[in-house]
Amino acid sequence: MLILEKPYVSETLIKTAIEQHLPVLRNAMSEQIVANGYPLHLYNDEEFVAAYQQRGRLYTMSENALGWLVEHLPDQELLDKIALLKDKATFRRICQDMYPDFFFCEEEIAMLDGIQADKLPYSLVLKPSVGFLSAGVHVVHDVQEWQAAIRDIQENFHKVSSQFPEFVIGTQKFLIEAYIHGEEYAVDTYFDDQGVPTILNIFHHRFANESDTSDRLYCSSRALYDQYEESFMNFLVQLNKVLQLHDFPMHIEFRYDGKKAIPIEINPLRFAGFCLNELQTHISGLHPITAYLKNIHLSKEEMWQGKEQDTYSFLVLERPADAAPEQVFNERKFREDMMDVLELRPLADPTVGVAATAFIRTDDAHKAELEHILHLDMHDYMI
């Protein structure tokens, strides 16, 4: 069962939903897709709730769907789990036994400017206890940056948070936690009806340098699974001893500090956004949402059979801020410059800020291509 929402629904997922006769909630997004010629199986609110009570598994495209769940879904256990995972401070408390040395605390927003900034253990991350995207998030390294962050929150946070319900972005409390140094990774997983976790994707989020915060490049490979799958799986098993999740998908971001994987945040009831999760479709031919809804457990041996030496990557190719509205992505040049472009998805809307997304494959002989991608000047790919 699917709830399709902005910002983006791929044609791959649409076709998967049609082929597998998946119930889709009737809303503005799904109706627009049907109007574009795709015969989705749409259910109104009452029909969708009734189907959920029979099927028991639900997938949402983004945080935008959470408001509908709160209003319509009579599954308080599920709603409580979502609320718990959305609350970053509560999540840190749950993980405290696993990470006893990790610093964090929670404060009322009105009390932030009264904190003795010179007593804090920098570097820190300051963010809403309940948040969405990067709204209200600040990385602070010293007292001056702390004071600047507090001023920004006081002046601008309520303007941003007012666009979302309290369930999506909380406005009362902020979490202060240690900044986690190390490489960034992400995992798509689901817990089956017995609470057993299955990992469907492991990504390495690569950056050009320490100041880079873009989503330009995510990579996956058999070597990545060999190195990190056990560590991530151990975390999931320990987490579910507390949460008791079942029939539940999630996307988790980690930092690996050289000794252990530390979770940054969890996104409940969905996998990686903007179709990053569909990298698995190119690796194994299986859509991860199908795997979750059909209870398919995929081993890394099955996933990477015959592709053990390859790296599969997902690219978000930003549209230059100064690109003219009539400029479009140069698909031919991009294909010529890359070893193996598996799929290219140009975005025509200049307001999105993304020129295209791409799925690519590289082998050992072309590893340098990935580093080159991190430094691409996107002006070279606009015509």
Residue spans of the language-model regions?
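Glycine-rich phosphate-binding loop of ATP-grasp-fold ATP-dependent ligases
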Residues: 124-154, 184-188, 208-224
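Protein kinase-like catalytic core scaffold
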Residues: 124, 198, 262-265
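ATP-dependent carboxylate/phosphate-activation module, predominantly the ATP-grasp catalytic core
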Residues: 178-181, 188-244, 267-296
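Conserved ATP-binding module of the ATP-grasp superfamily
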Residues: 101, 143-181, 242, 380
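Short, charged N-terminal beta->alpha structural module
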Residues: 1-37
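Conserved N-proximal alpha/beta basic substrate-recognition cap immediately N-terminal to
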Residues: 29-119, 363-375
